[in-house]
């Protein structure tokens, strides 16, 4: 038996847990909104479920999502939650006006002045108290915005307070506008440092306010979005990121305009041309230390200064890379991406093919397009040349990049230090810390580029054998140095140990689809799970072979079947699915009909019982068993009244009968 102190301690812990955490259902009931609206509100406010340890989860359920109670209570009086409730009330008014045919009221309700809208300005200020915090979230924001700027909208709507399951025209236009403004800023400020073309799209990296921002732009191609996909979670993130980037871009553009104005003023006054350097001022990194500052603070400032100097050196190499070069981009090349790289590196993009004003022509064809004549003074290169020059921070020789030539390997600058410079090495080391699984192999093309940059460079491992061995024998766990074993350390195994070592499990080929603890299951459950192939337990070898043979026979029959047999099999599967759907629909209809019949019969029976009760009361009044009260609003039982009077005469009190529960006899659908 549990001691009373232990029971009390359990109760106190449970109550404390309930006060500190709320489940998703409790949170939605507290906020009086649906789960879809609650999820959207949490995304906008930056509130996420909490991962609890097992002891806490056992108190209220292992499969539930838990939120901090104080965070949910903050949402009760939040402006966005209030606007959501106002929108629900507005929807009811619109439906009422449509049902009653009030066209004038409907026009007034649908105007932008009456329709509720929410603002994310206060939310962004809450989530990002400092500007550098917003810069650190730009990578995810721009990747998502570029994705939805490429997709075509499916719903025409300018507002976002409604919960749309597909991309709206308003969000699509705003996403395209933000992408254009971001590309314009990166090109004007010349902060682009790396680029890479992959099968997913174009990867870019820029240094903005001392932070490395990486984003992905998808390849632009004709697409058709699959129907029936719910996108409201992604659209909620998109809405927030668009509003955040509006603030970020305004700040960046205003700072850039101020820096350009200061530079021009300084050039006019002093005649000194200064580089258009990015402002890396960031809090304590540039603060002047007091005399009595501690060593930890001095070390942090020193690291920030070294990081800042490396980034400045990296930007200085890229900004004047294509200075004096003019590129003409052919029509088959995506001009948006290559114009961004060229402009960010100090080059110019020509709109017309005028050989006297052009130095390079970017063509993605095996030969020149019709109508374009080849000139000897021009260099005709493939698109990879632009990105390789950016990553090498050097105008590479065009050998191997000309039209019709086989291109060299396109190396990712995010996992390998292409230039072997201090700033690149520091960036790659940081990436490997964040992503330990990145392979440290250096391709031969990287050694060639390093040799071009620094003629005195000599590769330590040009063929990559050492790196290959390190990747092959490296493990996630740290290796422990084990001394070599001598003959004295050798111990012979016994017969049982040898037999155990040679024994192979009989269920080696069996697929494990679910992990189940066997001691907790009954024999019947074990048998059922073996039949359904859902248990992590030894299966009979004969059964396993039979299943494997059956699977192989099915695969063989599907490989050898004709198109007519395949069509017939597909048609039979479709018929089975349709039959199952019809059966399910029929079951649902039967349940609805039974529920409706139960409701109607309950109403009819209740009416009949009420009529019978009234008739019985009228009969008792006629027989004299009941009489009316003095005010005429109630009835009194004469026999019960006489008994009460006799008890009062004897000085006793008649025991009162408890009033019945009025909801006890009602049907369940009423309760």
Swiss-Prot record:
Chief location category: nucleus
Reply yes or no: does the keyword Cell membrane apply.
Answer: no
Q: Which SUPFAM superfamilies match?
A: BRCT domain
BRCT domain sequence ranges: 317-403
Query: Which stretches are tagged as biased composition: Basic and acidic residues?
Result: 634-651
Coiled-coil residue windows: 294-323, 548-584
Q: Which GO terms describe its cellular component?
A: nucleolus; nucleoplasm; PeBoW complex; preribosome, large subunit precursor
Highest rank taxon of the organism: Eukaryota
Alphabetically list the UniProt keywords.
Answer: Coiled coil, Nucleus, Ribosome biogenesis, rRNA processing
- What is an annotated GO biological process for this record, any one? maturation of 5.8S rRNA from tricistronic rRNA transcript (SSU-rRNA, 5.8S rRNA, LSU-rRNA)
Disordered: annotated span? 552-577, 634-671
Whether Transferase counts among this entry's keywords is no
Single Gene Ontology MF annotation: ribonucleoprotein complex binding
Q: Where in the cell is it found?
A: Nucleus, Nucleolus; Nucleus, Nucleoplasm
PANTHER family this protein is in? PESCADILLO - RELATED (PTHR12221), PESCADILLO HOMOLOG (PTHR12221:SF6)
What does the UniProt record say this protein does?
A: Required for maturation of ribosomal RNAs and formation of the large ribosomal subunit.
Q: Which family does it belong to?
A: Belongs to the pescadillo family.
Sorted alphabetically, which HAMAP family does this protein's record hold?
Pescadillo
Query: What is this protein's name?
Result: Pescadillo homolog
């Amino acid at each position: 038996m549990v001691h009373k102190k232990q029971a009390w301690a359990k109760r106190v812990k449970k109550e404390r847990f309930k006060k500190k955490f709320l489940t998703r259902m409790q949170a939605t009931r507290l906020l009086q909104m649906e789960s879809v609206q609650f999820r959207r509100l949490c995304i906008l406010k930056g509130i996420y479920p909490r991962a609890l340890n097992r002891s806490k989860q056992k108190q209220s359920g292992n499969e539930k999502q838990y939120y901090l109670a104080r965070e949910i209570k903050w949402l009760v009086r939040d402006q966005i939650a209030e606007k959501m409730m106002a929108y629900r009330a507005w929807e009811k008014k619109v439906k009422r006006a449509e049902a009653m045919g009030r066209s004038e009221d409907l026009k007034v309700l649908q105007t932008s002045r009456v329709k509720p809208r929410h603002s994310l300005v206060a939310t962004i200020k809450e989530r990002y108290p400092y500007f550098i915090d917003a810069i650190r979230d730009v990578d995810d924001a721009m990747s998502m915005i570029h994705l939805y700027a490429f997709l075509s909208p499916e719903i025409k709507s300018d507002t976002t307070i409604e919960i749309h399951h597909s991309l709206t025209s308003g969000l699509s236009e705003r996403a395209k506008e933000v992408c254009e403004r971001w590309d314009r800023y990166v090109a004007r400020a010349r902060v682009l440092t790396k680029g890479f073309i992959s099968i997913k799209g174009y990867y870019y990296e820029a240094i903005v306010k001392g932070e490395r921002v990486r984003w992905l732009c998808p390849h632009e191609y004709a697409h058709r979005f699959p129907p029936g996909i719910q996108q409201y979670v992604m659209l909620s993130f998109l809405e927030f990121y668009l509003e955040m980037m509006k603030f970020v871009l305004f700040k960046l553009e205003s700072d850039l305009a101020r820096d350009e104005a200061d530079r021009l003023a300084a050039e006019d006054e002093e005649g000194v041309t200064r580089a258009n350097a990015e402002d890396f001022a960031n809090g304590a990194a540039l603060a002047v230390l007091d005399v009595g500052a501690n060593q930890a603070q001095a070390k942090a400032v020193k690291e920030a200064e070294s990081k800042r100097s490396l980034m400045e050196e990296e930007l200085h190499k890229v900004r004047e890379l294509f200075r004096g070069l003019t590129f003409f981009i052919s029509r088959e090349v995506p001009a948006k991406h290559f114009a961004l790289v060229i402009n960010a590196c100090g080059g110019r993009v020509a709109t017309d093919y005028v050989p006297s004003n052009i130095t390079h022509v970017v063509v993605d064809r095996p030969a020149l397009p019709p109508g374009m004549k080849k000139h000897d003074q021009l260099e005709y290169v493939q698109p990879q040349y632009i990105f390789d020059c950016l990553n090498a921070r050097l105008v590479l020789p065009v050998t191997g990049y000309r039209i019709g030539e086989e291109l060299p390997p396109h190396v990712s600058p995010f996992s390998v230090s292409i230039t072997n410079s201090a700033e690149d090495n520091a960036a790659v080391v940081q990436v490997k810390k964040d992503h330990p699984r990145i392979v440290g192999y250096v391709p031969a093309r990287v050694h060639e580029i390093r040799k071009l940059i620094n003629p005195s460079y000599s590769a330590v491992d040009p063929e990559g054998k050492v790196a290959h061995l390190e990747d092959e024998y490296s493990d996630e766990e740290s290796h422990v140095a084990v001394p070599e074993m001598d003959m004295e350390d050798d111990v012979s195994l016994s017969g049982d140990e040898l037999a155990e070592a040679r024994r192979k499990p009989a269920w080696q080929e069996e697929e494990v689809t679910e992990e189940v603890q066997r001691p907790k299951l009954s024999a019947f459950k074990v048998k059922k799970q073996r039949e359904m192939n859902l248990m992590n337990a030894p299966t009979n070898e004969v059964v396993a072979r039979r299943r494997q043979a059956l699977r192989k026979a099915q695969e063989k029959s599907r490989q050898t079947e004709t198109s007519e047999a395949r069509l017939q099999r597909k048609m039979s599967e479709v018929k089975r699915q349709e039959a199952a759907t019809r059966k399910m629909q029929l079951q649902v209809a039967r349940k609805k009909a039974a529920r409706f019949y139960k409701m109607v019969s309950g109403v009819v029976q209740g009416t009949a019982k009420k009529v019978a009760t009234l008739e019985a009361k009228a009969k008792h009044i006629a027989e004299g068993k009941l009489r009316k009260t003095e005010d005429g609003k109630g009835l009194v039982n004469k026999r019960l009244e006489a008994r009460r009077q006799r008890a009062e005469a004897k000085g006793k009190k008649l025991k009162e009968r408890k009033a019945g529960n009025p909801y006890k006899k009602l049907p369940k659908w009423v309760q």
